[in-house]
Amino acid sequence: MKNRFSIALALVMALVMAFASATLADADATAEFDPDAHIAALAGSYTELFKTIAAPEMDDKWLEKCTAIVGEESAEAASEMLRTACTAEIFGQDAIDAYTQDPDSARFDCYFQGGIVTFVFDGNKVSGLDADGNEVFAHEYYYVQDIPDVIACHVYKTDDADAGEFTYLCLSDDTPAETYHIEFRYGDDLDALGQYYEGKYAYWLAAGILSDADDKMIDDCIQLFVDENLASEEAA
């Protein structure tokens, strides 16, 4: 059988875009957006998504779900592609340089940056903890604008002068109740945050899942990722 699952640049980019199910698609939806309700819907503690759903003990889940869509012969390649497309460990200029030299190796870094291991959302207050549980930052954020193009996100900002790389918080429409995970970016340069493939945040999109996610939420999240990225494939 023809192997349809080489990790080409265009496909990897499509994978990341497809996982964000909401896209700020039309003006009416944007007009109805309630920024306070949205950030409130994210209440909870989050760990890195792909360290959970792409852990070795999840291999069988991925394989089973991929087999159901692309067939047994292509399932392993599809599973490997999906699990690695968002687990790069470089972003920004390092990623730009690497992927310019080898476009077929392009992937997204979907991990937390800035020494953060856990994000905590509590209404408009967002904080980040390091590996020892120490608080790295804690600020209150207020909605300022949408970025409807390229990354499609809602931008929140803190007025705290010492926020540094945590000044802006760009949230996708994802919520744990609807898509079992969240996607977001953060930084001090709003123009750079609005670009996926250029600037200091190139090839980076943080993704989180509730720290206390149960087996069903994890399973549903994997199913969503597989369905949205392999739906157009046909098992031979």
Each model region followed by its residue ranges:
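Bacterial N-terminal signal peptides that target proteins for export
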Residues: 1-9
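Bacterial N-terminal signal peptides
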Residues: 10-19
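Polar/charged side chains located within well-ordered beta-strands of beta-rich proteins
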Residues: 17, 46, 181-183
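Sec-dependent signal peptide cleavage junction
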Residues: 18-31
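Extreme N-terminus of proteins, especially the signal/transit-peptide cleavage junction
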Residues: 31-37
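Short, solvent-exposed loop/hinge segments that bridge or flank secondary-structure elements
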Residues: 36, 47-124, 165-175
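A glycine-anchored, Pro-Gly-centered beta-turn/N-cap motif
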Residues: 40-45
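Calycin-type beta-barrel ligand-binding domains and close structural analogs
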Residues: 100-236
